[in-house]
Amino acid sequence: MHPTEKIVRQFHESWDMCDPERGAEIIADDCQFEDVARGEKQPGKEAYKADYHRWREAFPDGICKVENVIVSQCGEWAMVEFRNTGTNTGVLRSSLGDFPPTGKKAEVRYCSVMRVKNGMVVEGRDYYDSATIARQLGLVS
């Protein structure tokens, strides 16, 4: 397994293992994350941990399963296709406001584009269809 693949898998598997510290240990202090669907930038380890806890609050039973990892020829970049599933039993906090629990299950496919340097994640962007989440949770029809 390419070292970059190992790092990005550790990052995503930390969500599934309910272990944000495992993910944080391979995030550079000056890492820049961006949630493209929400239009939010999340700089550094603390922002990563806050986002982890925001998601875990909304989906306490949430599971993150990596489906594919493709590493670029230069070895710095990886594309990670993964699937998040969970039941919305907690408040879903977002840039659009806070939504009360719906008790409904959501299953959404994501794509992360991540850059790894010297064994640390230095940049990442998540792409997903937020309308799919809203429909599955009954927030829109």
Which residues fall in each region the model found?
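C-terminal and inter-domain tail/linker signature
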Residues: 1-141
